[in-house]
Amino acid sequence: MPTIQQLVRDGRYTKSFKTASPALDRCPQKRGVCTRVYTTTPKKPNSALRKVARVRLSNGIEVTAYIPGEGHNLQEHSIVLIRGGRVKDLPGVRYHIVRGSLDTSGVADRRNGRSKYGAKRPKEGAKK
């Protein structure tokens, strides 16, 4: 507990909060253009070909973003919307691409968790 004299001399200081997604500039999402779409492999215990894209954001920063879901229609020069959220087994990937917005299509034939993948509600007659 500081003395009054120490508070007068030094004052209180606020702890600075370091954001997990600095390229978003405190925005919930940002728009960007894909400069490269490719696959990469995850860290040690896992094995896969994860789909990622290099995206140049509207503020000029270039980031690597993960493309969630099965299958995608992205290619170079596609306009995408990115949100924060890292991929634990891909080092350096701190952003997700939002499916179903701008040039990104939703996941086809998705039935559960559709809102996270931009999939429309299936027609009632089209059951299995």
From Swiss-Prot:
<feature type="modified residue" description="3-methylthioaspartic acid">
    <location>
        <position position="89"/>
    </location>
</feature>
<comment type="function">
    <text>With S4 and S5 plays an important role in translational accuracy.</text>
</comment>
<dbReference type="GO" id="GO:0003735">
    <property type="term" value="F:structural constituent of ribosome"/>
</dbReference>
<keyword id="KW-0820">tRNA-binding</keyword>
<dbReference type="InterPro" id="IPR012340">
    <property type="entry name" value="NA-bd_OB-fold"/>
</dbReference>
<keyword id="KW-0694">RNA-binding</keyword>
<keyword id="KW-0689">Ribosomal protein</keyword>
<dbReference type="GO" id="GO:0019843">
    <property type="term" value="F:rRNA binding"/>
</dbReference>
<keyword id="KW-0699">rRNA-binding</keyword>
<dbReference type="InterPro" id="IPR006032">
    <property type="entry name" value="Ribosomal_uS12"/>
</dbReference>
<dbReference type="Pfam" id="PF00164">
    <property type="entry name" value="Ribosom_S12_S23"/>
</dbReference>
<dbReference type="GO" id="GO:0015935">
    <property type="term" value="C:small ribosomal subunit"/>
</dbReference>
<protein>
    <recommendedName>
        <fullName>Small ribosomal subunit protein uS12</fullName>
    </recommendedName>
</protein>
<comment type="similarity">
    <text>Belongs to the universal ribosomal protein uS12 family.</text>
</comment>
<feature type="region of interest" description="Disordered">
    <location>
        <begin position="101"/>
        <end position="128"/>
    </location>
</feature>
<keyword id="KW-0488">Methylation</keyword>
<comment type="subunit">
    <text>Part of the 30S ribosomal subunit. Contacts proteins S8 and S17. May interact with IF1 in the 30S initiation complex.</text>
</comment>
<dbReference type="GO" id="GO:0000049">
    <property type="term" value="F:tRNA binding"/>
</dbReference>
<dbReference type="GO" id="GO:0006412">
    <property type="term" value="P:translation"/>
</dbReference>
<comment type="function">
    <text>Interacts with and stabilizes bases of the 16S rRNA that are involved in tRNA selection in the A site and with the mRNA backbone. Located at the interface of the 30S and 50S subunits, it traverses the body of the 30S subunit contacting proteins on the other side and probably holding the rRNA structure together. The combined cluster of proteins S8, S12 and S17 appears to hold together the shoulder and platform of the 30S subunit.</text>
</comment>
<keyword id="KW-0687">Ribonucleoprotein</keyword>
<dbReference type="InterPro" id="IPR005679">
    <property type="entry name" value="Ribosomal_uS12_bac"/>
</dbReference>
